[in-house]
Amino acid sequence: MSDNFLSTYSVETRDFLARFNEKYDFNSIRKNLNDLKDLKVLIVGDGIVDEYHYCEPMGKSAKANIIVNRYLENEVFAGGAFAIANHVSSLCDEVQLVTLLGKENSREDFVSANLNPNVEAKFFFREDGPTIVKKRYVHNYSNQKLFEINFINDRFIDEDLEAKVIDYFESIIPLAPCHHVL
């Protein structure tokens, strides 16, 4: 009897995995991953502080047409470019991250504490906006997102900050050549 009835994967996924298994063996995959170790990678992008606030519904509000929720707990993660830098640093020894933080409530301590030791971060601070924070409110039992609030300024940075960022890139590129920029 086939285990197709018990598989958690779709037919397309099972077919892909079968073809992948025929083409690559474990040792070649391990060698290719180990070959990434000496790459120098520069990551440029938006770091995001991801907050998940778990709650449970209590019922309908008597004063408004909304559902009232009881707060239970929260988790905070380094997301966006912060997460990418951490993932890449698990494969490559040298990773540099360039990103913007907000001047007010920068969350710099949290971000720095949650980057892997081999991630060298260069933060630029924008005066006109916060560090990007995404607060998601999630039903504790079903894990369904109820709503999300984003703290973000998605307008262009001002000319002075742009000049600082460009000057920084012009100063590091010749001195520390990167194999890849993400």
Model-derived segments and their meaning:
Residues 68-70:
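Short beta-alpha connecting loops at secondary-structure transitions
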Residues 1-63, 72-182:
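Ribokinase/PfkB-type carbohydrate-kinase core domain
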